[in-house]
Amino acid sequence: MGAAGDAAIGRESRELMSAADVGRTISRIAHQIIEKTALDDPVGPDAPRVVLLGIPTRGVTLANRLAGNITEYSGIHVGHGALDITLYRDDLMIKPPRPLASTSIPAGGIDDALVILVDDVLYSGRSVRSALDALRDVGRPRAVQLAVLVDRGHRELPLRADYVGKNVPTSRSESVHVRLREHDGRDGVVISR
């Protein structure tokens, strides 16, 4: 977040994750994906084609970083892209209009692939539900998993993440802000009231 984002965080805030913590966490999630999806044995019978799709905005950046780490650690190129959920949200009439983001699906599409949705914060689960609806219009994956940097609880839908960087118990009056250098000039996670 830039200066405006910093001002929106408010006076009562504390750092949950430093830049180094964010880097280590993304690295750990990448290793977990490699192990859980059998990417470390890409010719094995259970090794699926894996596609990472980020939910805009910061989920896309996280998907890009995860894909880079997975390639670095395993030598396997993982397709990655973005999945715009704007028109699938259930709060379109409640919240102010937002610009459409773009959906970019890697070559080969998502049919029969293991799609891992990537987001920065898992809260109510409504963004993930919107992503599942959007995904249905893009193709038919073999399976769908979810990776998040922060899980703050307070689910309103029966969803859970397969890969979680950090579980952070919060109150509903608190906000979790993920900062990524590509958008905010630095990495970090802050909680505020």
Swiss-Prot record:
Source organism of the structure: Mycobacterium tuberculosis (strain ATCC 25618 / H37Rv)
InterPro entries, A to Z: PRibTrfase_dom, PRTase-like, PyrR, PyrR_bifunctional
Protein's name according to its UniProt entry: Bifunctional protein PyrR
Enzyme class: transferase
Transcription as UniProt keyword: yes
HAMAP family tied to this protein: PyrR
Keywords: Glycosyltransferase, Transcription, Transcription regulation, Transferase
Family: Belongs to the purine/pyrimidine phosphoribosyltransferase family. PyrR subfamily.
GO cellular component entries: peptidoglycan-based cell wall
Record-listed substrate binding positions: T57, R58, R98, D119, D120, V121, L122, Y123, S124, G125, R126, S127, R152, V176
